[in-house]
Amino acid sequence: MSAEPELIELRELAPSGRIGPGRTRLERANALRIAPGTTRNPSQQHVPGRGHRFQPAGPTTHTWCDLCGDFIWGVVRKGLQCAHCKFTCHYRCRALVCLDCCGPRDLGWDSALERDTNVDEAVERETPDLSQAETEQKIKDYNGQINSNLFMSLNKDGSYTGFIKVQLKLVRPVSVPSSKKPPSLQDARRGTGRSTAVKRRTSFYLPKDAIKHLHVLSRTRAREVIEALLRKFMVVDDPRKFALFERTERHGQVYLRKLSDDEQPLKLRLLAGPSEKALSFVLKENDSGEVNWDAFSMPELHNFLRILQREEEEHLRQILQKYSRCRQKIQEALHACPLG
């Protein structure tokens, strides 16, 4: 990546630009792993899908399939997850996985700090409401402490604009529209928003050191920041698959807190000051195990109920068959025993 920070201008999002829950399901094309600074030789023979060790996902795994993009739903069968690279998919999608396992990803963070990391619950932080004079003074103090030109500016209506830096710390692959060649970071930098006519998708791993600067309003919400980042990389995965975290360092420990959808990152940045240790933002997979059912559409919720009913019926059928076989064996043993 270039040393120059790439800026994403994020103003008001029009309703038509929002990413709704009922998008067209995308089909999987050939999935490739793109290593930063390398190109894939078409003449090389490649056997896809090697190295994975899939095992049943845990009972708290509520996430989206890395292959088809659909939500992984169920109580008994939660899907599969690779023990090495955390690739997660439906049972039905296992045979279609073409992306090779990359092994455990070292994301280059301070190992001494990461061992003592505390991940707080996704509780919205109480932020004080600043008056116009207090906001103006805070912005003046903030601009006086930074060593770059990424200043904050106060608007006439009392809102303000500024820059936030987001580090993409993603373990699992992301999906982009399929093309003749895999997209690079340079392609994403030149690209536009995601197309609604996309029918196929390609998977790759984002570089571990991917960082984006976003120019946002004070009222820009965390969910809008996530959507803007995905559009910039042309990622077609569901935005609910990801979450924005605030990262702070205190007394040699790293604390992560998941931001709620309606929190305002620029306001948090202003209150914390420009220090990266006091506050930084990280984009990660939303693997907290919590599901915001209000974010799903009515057809999706009805579909989940149908899946739950089918799974319940299948589970009951298996239990009845198990007890029926046991009963039959006991009866056979009784008939085989001599009388007296």
Swiss-Prot record:
GO aspect biological process, one term = regulation of cell cycle
Q: Name one GO molecular function term.
A: small GTPase binding
Q: Which Pfam family is one of this chain's hits?
A: C1_1
The record's annotation in InterPro entries points to: C1-like_sf, PE/DAG-bd, RA_dom, RASSF1-6, RASSF1_RA, SARAH_dom, Ubiquitin-like_domsf
Q: Where on the chain is N-acetylserine found, per UniProt?
A: 2
Q: Low complexity bias located where?
A: 175-185
Which superkingdom does the taxonomy of this entry point to? Eukaryota
Which cysteine pairs are joined by S-S bonds?
none
PROSITE patterns for this protein? RA, SARAH, ZF_DAG_PE_1, ZF_DAG_PE_2
Kindly state the subunit structure of this protein: Interacts with MAP1S and XPA. Binds to the N-terminal of CDC20 during prometaphase. Binds to STK3/MST2 and STK4/MST1. Recruited to the TNFRSF1A and TNFRSF10A complexes in response to their respective cognate ligand, after internalization. Can self-associate. Part of a complex with MDM2, DAXX, RASSF1 and USP7.
Instruction: Quote the protein name from its UniProt record.
Output: Ras association domain-containing protein 1
The organism encoding this protein is: Mus musculus (Mouse)
Q: What is the lineage of its organism?
A: Eukaryota, Metazoa, Chordata, Craniata, Vertebrata
